[in-house]
């Protein structure tokens, strides 16, 4: 593989995470405006975003097999066509059914692109370098989470319609589409070069189960938390702008944390540092949820920084449970994380309706505690140490 080709593939991976980050994180900012647009209460509107999350889940799950049938480049180019259709649907339809369909399509495109991005990184890099590369790739999720709420706040404050936020997000996919030209992708399945050596199938082990539960609880907890922070902050008397700043600060700190940990992780055992970070994140979220508005800015910055490496380290440890990284195993852990995404409003919507936004934040806190327990238990069964030893010889 040429260096310029590797750079293009790496940038496609970066932007695939940015696309998903933008679509998922901007929800909390535009939900109120979309609810007004369709004359619905916010708690009911939140349920329609389940279509976005369902699209992400289904596409990541199916793409574990689709990658071996449909070439990656073809998938990305077809995704561009779907993206244009979905954004056009949001702009020109006033029907809730069409809105839900467009959200589902956006989810499908996002899920396919993100699973391709993750696979490309695990395919191109090995060992601890894979972990730091995945972490840097995931930082683009946070970067989008920092930039797009600011764009959304800027547009909405000027009474520009909410769907222009999604048009801006569509520009990320335009960049991915352009990068596919003159770029060679790894061939999989029937398109892969034939080898005589039989491929040995490895058992995944119970560590994958612990990591999958951790991935689900972490994403459900994180998105359940960050989706309702704006409503919670407004309930404490903050303006929409200040609430948006809290969300942007979280993702800015998350992004800086990822850059820092992509260097720091090289010097630590991944399972041990993951357990420490999961415990710290649970404590810091509790401090935010029970603190005063004066301390919220600082506690959300600390939470963003120390929780930044958790999800990517879960995926990296998952890929290291077998000697040869398996696209199906990586996609399985990703799928569990995406189930967490899909359940975000299914779980938190009724909680907010009955008990208010703070109850949703405390539920998220409980989920972070489960992540800590899973990471601790992983220490007794993880295979990453023996596989790292084998690859280093």
UniProtKB/Swiss-Prot annotation:
**Single GO MF descriptor:** transmembrane transporter activity
Q: Which InterPro entries match?
A: MFS (IPR011701), MFS_dom (IPR020846), MFS_trans_sf (IPR036259), MFS_TsgA (IPR023528), MFS_TsgA-like (IPR050375)
Record's GO cellular component terms: plasma membrane
The lineage's top-level taxon is Bacteria
Cross-referenced CDD domains: MFS_FucP_MFSD4_like
Does the record bear Transmembrane helix in its keywords? yes
The record lists the membrane-crossing segments as: 11-31, 51-71, 78-98, 101-121, 134-154, 162-182, 206-226, 245-265, 273-293, 297-317, 332-352, 361-381
Record bears the keyword Repeat: no
Which Pfam families does the UniProt record give?
A: MFS_1
Going by the UniProt record, its keywords in alphabetical order are:
Cell inner membrane, Cell membrane, Membrane, Transmembrane, Transmembrane helix
- Gene3D superfamilies this protein is in? MFS general substrate transporter like domains
The record describes its membrane topology as: Multi-pass membrane protein
Q: Where in the cell is it found?
A: Cell inner membrane
Family statement drawn from the similarity comment of this UniProt entry: Belongs to the major facilitator superfamily. TsgA family.
Q: Give the protein name, as stated in the record.
A: Protein TsgA
Gene (name only)? tsgA
């Amino acid at each position: 593989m040429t260096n310029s080709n590797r750079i293009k593939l790496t940038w496609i991976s970066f932007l695939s995470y940015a696309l998903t980050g933008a679509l998922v994180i901007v929800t909390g900012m535009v939900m109120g405006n979309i609810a007004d647009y369709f004359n619905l209460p916010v708690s009911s509107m939140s349920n329609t975003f389940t279509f976005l999350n369902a699209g992400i889940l289904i596409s990541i799950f199916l793409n574990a097999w689709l990658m071996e049938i449909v070439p990656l480049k073809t998938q990305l180019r077809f995704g561009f066509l779907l993206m244009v259709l979905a954004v056009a649907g949001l702009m020109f339809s006033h029907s809730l059914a069409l809105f839900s369909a467009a959200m589902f399509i956006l989810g499908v495109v996002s899920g396919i692109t993100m699973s391709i991005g993750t696979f490309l990184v695990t395919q191109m890099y090995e060992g601890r370098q894979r972990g730091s590369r995945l972490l840097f790739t995931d930082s683009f999720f946070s970067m989008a989470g920092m930039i797009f709420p600011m764009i959304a706040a800027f547009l909405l404050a000027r009474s520009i319609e909410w769907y222009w936020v999604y048009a801006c997000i569509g520009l990320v996919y335009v960049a991915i589409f352009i990068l596919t030209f003159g770029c060679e992708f790894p061939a999989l399945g029937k398109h892969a070069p034939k080898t005589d050596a039989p491929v040995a199938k490895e058992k995944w082990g119970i560590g994958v189960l612990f990591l999958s539960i951790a991935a689900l609880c972490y994403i459900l907890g994180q998105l359940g938390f960050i989706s309702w922070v704006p409503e919670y902050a407004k309930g404490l008397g903050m303006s929409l702008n200040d609430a948006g700043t809290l969300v942007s600060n979280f993702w800015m700190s998350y992004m800086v944390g990822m850059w820092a940990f992509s260097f720091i992780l090289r010097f630590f055992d991944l399972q041990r540092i993951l357990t420490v970070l999961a415990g710290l994140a649970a404590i810091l979220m509790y401090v935010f949820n029970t603190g005063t508005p004066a301390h919220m800015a600082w506690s959300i910055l600390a939470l963003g920084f120390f929780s930044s490496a958790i999800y990517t380290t879960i995926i990296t440890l998952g890929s290291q449970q077998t000697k040869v990284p398996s696209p199906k195993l990586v996609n399985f852990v990703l799928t569990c994380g995406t189930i967490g995404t899909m359940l975000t409003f299914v779980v938190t919507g009724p909680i907010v309706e009955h008990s208010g936004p703070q109850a949703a934040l405390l539920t998220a806190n409980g989920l972070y505690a489960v992540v800590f327990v899973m990471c601790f238990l992983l220490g007794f069964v993880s295979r990453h140490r023996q596989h790292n030893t084998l690859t280093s010889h």
